[in-house]
Amino acid sequence: MQRISKTFHHESYFKKRIQGLIFSSGQRVIEDPKKYGLPGFTKYYTMNDYKTNNQNATFLNGIEIDFQTRFWYLPNFLRGLVFNTNYTWIESKVKYPRTIFEQTIVHEPEFDVLINNVDSTYIDRLLDQPQEIINYSIGYDYKGFSGRFSMNYISNIFSATNFWTELRQDTDAYKRYDLSIKQKLFIKGLELYINASNLSEAVDITRLRGFSLQDSNFDDSYYDYMLDKIHSNENTSIDEMLNNVPRKQRSKAYEQHYGKTIDLGFRFLF
């Protein structure tokens, strides 16, 4: 008699090219109100949240590995063990438009201050896209019983663009644990279930790339290091210097507490 394998393994590589990505590019001066369908008096007003289509193509590629198995070859009650895992790695590169306000003072034919939008770009990851996603679950099935303990991990996500590097936002890596159990009862179709979510009470934190000198927990040595770098080399990249600041030293934009939830009940399947 031949036994059929109860193991599934899958690997894939994906690549995407996105054209016309819509995103919030920050502030923009209204040079020509007609261009935006606005009345004439709004000339030189500022749009605080200007959404636009990115004229630069967005490139994204990555790999995904999926593995599922049931330990049918183990002796006795251990045959009910199951294990599933999924790993995704993603790399993205986006040229985001960056608009600088340029002021020009003219004296002829009359005194005036002209404001123009000077467009440039900066490179970063795709918005709302993590670099790594890891999922796994360990479970056990036996007759009418089924249980799963699972973990979900999402690496930090680029969550908000901004003209100023230090005001761009990333989330901290997020990891949570869940538990799901069900047991069939003596009445056909009736089940007892328990669902427990976020057992470790993980907190979702979003941080600015900059820091605050007013924060009592901030280590001033990082700021002193940045000043020394700027004095020794005026062309030093602010992006590189901010990347050297540990995540927990950066200012929090906000944090969300979801808490732990446990559901207990009966379910009847028709």
Predicted regions and their residues:
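Solvent-exposed loop segments that connect transmembrane elements
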Residues: S25-K51, P97-Y122, F163-T165, R209-R250
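Residues that define the transmembrane beta-barrel architecture of outer-membrane proteins
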Residues: S5, A57-I63, P130-I134, A173-Y177, ...
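Structural signature of Gram-negative outer-membrane beta-barrels, strongest in the C-terminal barrel
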Residues: M1-R17, Q131, S137
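Outer-membrane beta-barrel proteins
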Residues: Q2-S5, F67-P75, L81, Y142-G144, ...
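Transmembrane beta-strands of outer-membrane beta-barrel proteins
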Residues: T7-E11, R79-T85, Y136, F145-F149, ...
